[in-house]
Each structure stands twice: as structure tokens, then as C-alpha cells.
């Protein structure tokens, strides 16, 4: 490995789908598009059945995980950063966000030609066992993380 070959002290973090108020205007990921629409009071639009299952982690939890890895991780090891309680399909993610924002989920399914550019990954779930062995635990469920995100980005958190 690189660590052994060059005698460096390094650890690796493999982040799952990280979400939160850190989303940028140029972010084109589906979850960022859902969030922008929900904040605008518009329906969340799915471009697929939303059956793909992913691990999610709220940005504040991910930051804490990175700190745990930096302080306690073993050199040469890789750690999955994921919340084992926040595994959901894209549709479940969208429905949770829509419910919190008071909007609906609608579908705009692409043509076969358009679908060719879409991801074919159906399951992207990470196990955070090694990270949890360092003592790290997430503080936010998917719903809590989305609720905090909406409050922060809408300015409610400042009131």
C-alpha cells in the first residue's frame, strides 16, 4: 500500500451520500435538486422509480466521523463513513424531505434514450463497523438531518 511504500501515516475515509446545509448551487446530484425544489415550495420530482438504495450521512455527523478517523484511526486503514440507521431508497429520501417541506413527490420518468445516462447502481450501502469501533456514533437520523437542513437553509434556524 501507499502507506507502507512511502512510510507515511495516513488513513482513508470513504464517505457515503452526505447531505445537509452544505449543498452548493452547482451540485447536480438528485438529493441536492430535491432540496432546492422543496425549499422553493415546489414538488420534489423523481426521474426514476427511486428504488436505488443508499447509505446517507448528515454533514455534521460526517464531520464528526472524519475527526474520529483523524484522531483515532489506524494508519493504513480505510473507514466507511455512513449512518447504519439512514439507509433508504431515493424515493424514501424524497418522500421524507417532501413531507417535512409540505410538498409532494411527483414522477417525470425519462425516455429510454435519456435513461442511458443514468446510474445503474441499485444499491450503495456502506457498513460503518470499523468507524463505530473507534467510538463514533451518528447523532442525526435521516429525518432529523433533513429537518435541520431545511431549517438552516430557509433561515428558520436563525430565528
Question: What is each residue range found by the language model?
Answer:
Residues 34-46, 99-112, 129:
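A short C-terminal helix-loop "cap" of Rossmann-like NAD(P)-dependent dehydrogenase/epimerase domains
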Residues 72-116:
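Mid/C-terminal beta-alpha module of Rossmann-like enzyme folds, strongest
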Amino acid at each position: 500500500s501507499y502507506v507502507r511504500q512511502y512510510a507515511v501515516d495516513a488513513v482513508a475515509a470513504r464517505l457515503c451520500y452526505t447531505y445537509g446545509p452544505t449543498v452548493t448551487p452547482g451540485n447536480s446530484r438528485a438529493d441536492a435538486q430535491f432540496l432546492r425544489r422543496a425549499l422553493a415550495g415546489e414538488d420534489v420530482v423523481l426521474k426514476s422509480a427511486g428504488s436505488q438504495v443508499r447509505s446517507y450521512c448528515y454533514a455534521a455527523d460526517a464531520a464528526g466521523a472524519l475527526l474520529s478517523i483523524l484522531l483515532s484511526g489506524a494508519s493504513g486503514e480505510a473507514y466507511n463513513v455512513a449512518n447504519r440507521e439512514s439507509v433508504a431508497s431515493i424515493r424514501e429520501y424524497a418522500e421524507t424531505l417532501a413531507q417535512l417541506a409540505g410538498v409532494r413527490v411527483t414522477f417525470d420518468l425519462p425516455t429510454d434514450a435519456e435513461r442511458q445516462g443514468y446510474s445503474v447502481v441499485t444499491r450503495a450501502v456502506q457498513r460503518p463497523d470499523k468507524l463505530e469501533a473507534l467510538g463514533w456514533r451518528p447523532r442525526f437520523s435521516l429525518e432529523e438531518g433533513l429537518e435541520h437542513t431545511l431549517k438552516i437553509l430557509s433561515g428558520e434556524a436563525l430565528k
